[in-house]
Amino acid sequence: MSAISVLSHDDFVAQISSKYTDVIGAKLGGKIISFSDEWFAEANNLIQPGLPIRQVGKFTPAGAWYDGWETRRHNPEPADWVIIKLGVASATIIGTEIDTAFFNGNHAPAISVEGTFVADDKDLDSAKWEEIIPKTECGPSQRHFFARDALTEAPYTHVRLKQYPDGGIARFRLYGKPTAVFPADLNTEIDLAHVSSGGIAVAFSDQHFGAVDNLLIPGRGKDMGDGWETKRSREPGHVDWVIVKLGAPGYVDRVIVDTANFMGNYPQSITVHAINSPDADPAHDDPNWKLVVDRTKTGPHKIHEYIRADAASGSPDADETQKVLTSANDEVFTHAKLTIIPDGGVKRFRVFGRRASA
């Protein structure tokens, strides 16, 4: 069994959440499959994006309203539980955040996390569960950060959170590495930056209003809240940036910068660079970054597409198409950097290409 460490928030960010993906989040497609009880508050709240909130004095027919999962008192079983299907095909797991915000006197005294791999939800009844995080104490109204010393050996499709014996948990985050399912043909174009391909944002300048990991999730979202948005800059020459480690080294054929829902706060312009840095994540000012998309203006609520110079046409869904530099045609890259000038919001960042090797 892997050793488990209790980390501070800063250490968890540095070691876990900045390097791995929350593979159960609702915005990624995580889904509650079943639960033992949700008398006071729904289990679905566990995987919602954003920090939990409190509305003092708000009641439902079941009792006080809580932004989390809360079960009834006096559970006759050892633990209450909830089963969650990952938002990716499968993933290995490295750590978890358990947030008991606003649950004080009714919080979960202890938790554990288990995982299983099944081909279909109907196989869960006979599934074999493996321990990921052992039974660990929790305190009231606080964020708890637990990390393994290594990724699990096997990937999982579903996880089971237990609370002993009952109570409330506001949010549940589970970090790991998606197990990408790549096409056998290396010439097949895929989104190398997509979270399901293993893409992850490893560094950024700012994420004041919206998190950088939103750039890599499926779909075009629903509002400005599920994109990346930085605070307003006041200094001349200011830019914001994000570095994405691609899920696999590859050749860049097409880039998309989507400003969906950003109407008065989209970037004035953008650039895209790429680099081959297989041994370490590069610094944003590394001199080896190569220009892939030259500085171009962006517009509100648009899909901006940039394609190889020798490509016949781009995506039919694109609102605006440019050409990428030919330097991207035959070079292998491991990371891409999106720079927004001077600041603003972007919904999605796609880096389509071909893997360099199997």
Task: For every predicted segment, state its role.
Residues 1-77, 94, 101-117, 123-125, ...:
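Juxtadomain low-complexity/linker regions and immediately adjacent membrane-anchoring helices
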Residues 55-73, 81-85, 125-142, 219, ...:
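Acidic/polar, low-complexity linker and loop regions
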Residues 85-89, 130-168, 239-241, 246, ...:
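Beta-sandwich interaction modules
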Residues 247-249, 260-269, 279-289, 300:
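Beta-sheet repeat architectures centered on beta-propellers
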